A protein has these predicted regions:
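Serine-dependent acyl-ester chemistry module
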Residues: 1-63, 67, 75-84
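Histidine-centered active-site loop/cap adjacent to the catalytic His
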Residues: 70-71, 87-118
Length: 118
């Protein structure tokens, strides 16, 4: 399994990560309350994961999923097939970009759904 970075965070990064962790805790309360089986998918950008803050958020999401035994499709780890024309801006995909993502995640999504009996 992939290990997480142990880089030293500055105060702003710590604050941002802590706020994200709090949102994950609140989300987990709802997941458990309503007996939801979540499937998380990591976010990518047109230039990969050069955004340090996005990297930190994804790292926390992966830890959260591992700790709670939730499924996650780590799109950031399984593809680098995108170019600038697949995005309207740094994060929002065009129709072509969305189709690429769908083709990439579909096999894993089907596998997860079969595992949970859907």
């Amino acid at each position: 399994k992939k290990k997480y970075s142990n880089i030293e965070l500055d105060n702003q990064e710590k604050k941002m990560v802590l706020a994200f962790k709090d949102r994950l805790i609140n989300l987990n309360i709802q997941i458990l309350k309503y007996n939801i089986y979540p499937i998380f998918i990591t976010q990518i950008q047109y230039d990969g994961l050069r955004d340090h803050y996005l990297f930190l958020i994804i790292q926390e999401l992966k830890k959260f999923c591992e700790e709670n035994d939730y499924s996650i499709i780590a799109l950031d780890e399984i593809t680098s097939e995108f170019d600038k024309n697949d995005f309207y801006d740094t994060v929002h995909t065009t129709v072509a970009g969305s189709k690429k993502i769908a083709k990439i995640i579909y096999p894993t999504l089907v596998k997860i759904l079969k595992q949970i009996g859907l």
